[in-house]
Amino acid sequence: MLLQAVLLDLGDTLVHLSRPWDDVFHANLEALHNYLMKLGLRLDFEQFAETFIRIFEDASARADVYKVEIPMGDIIAKALRKSKLEVLGVDLIRDAEVEFFRPEVEAWQLYPDTVETLAALKNDGLKMGIISNAKSDWAVHAILEKNGIEGFFGVIVTSAFMRIRKPRPEIFIRALTDIGTKPSETVFVGDSVEADISGARKVGMRSIHVLRRPIESTHPADPEATVTSLREAANQITAWKNGSLEKPTPDECSLI
């Protein structure tokens, strides 16, 4: 089967954080606290932060073990209940989620080769989609829009929306169904051995591991290709689309 579509991871594949994660997370918490204070909820920042972090870390641990996603809105609502504060309505919880993620959205920036790679794949006639493990569907769309690349993707599937995480096959199957291609016609590009590479393999997709920096992983990596940039990934995809099973040499890894 010839390739018809490319599905990609988002964080650390197309975009990267411009600030340390701890700084970004603290800014998120401050933004959430400020929003709640404006609503008239009186809460000490340090106490609320301690409660929130405990719930956030528990949700993250559950996600890691069971591959389920607890969306940020649920985490915020639980933190308010634990703080013995009035639980906000659905609309206000959604707004609180948006305010929490605003600093983080601004911190995610494109890799230098992202736009040209996406443009090359689009010009090659390939459909594209995103599968992202994230606690906020809104944040994923906002990161794509802020960086000017949302228009490249006909399909955007998040773990927050699905409430399950990569590498579970259901999230890949949903994206394949939405984009309208078979696994054999689709390649997945991502940076995580466990979430991206093993997840794609479970549903019969070819995969490309984008190894931007050395990693230590207990999960065996068996991608069809390993590259160090999106440029190399694009050239590998073009080779597959043209029917070649060979990996391009480094000299061939330049976009036209």
Kindly give the residue locations of the regions a language model identified:
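N-terminal helical cap/lid subdomain that shapes the substrate entry/recognition surface
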Residues: 2-112, 116, 123-124, 137
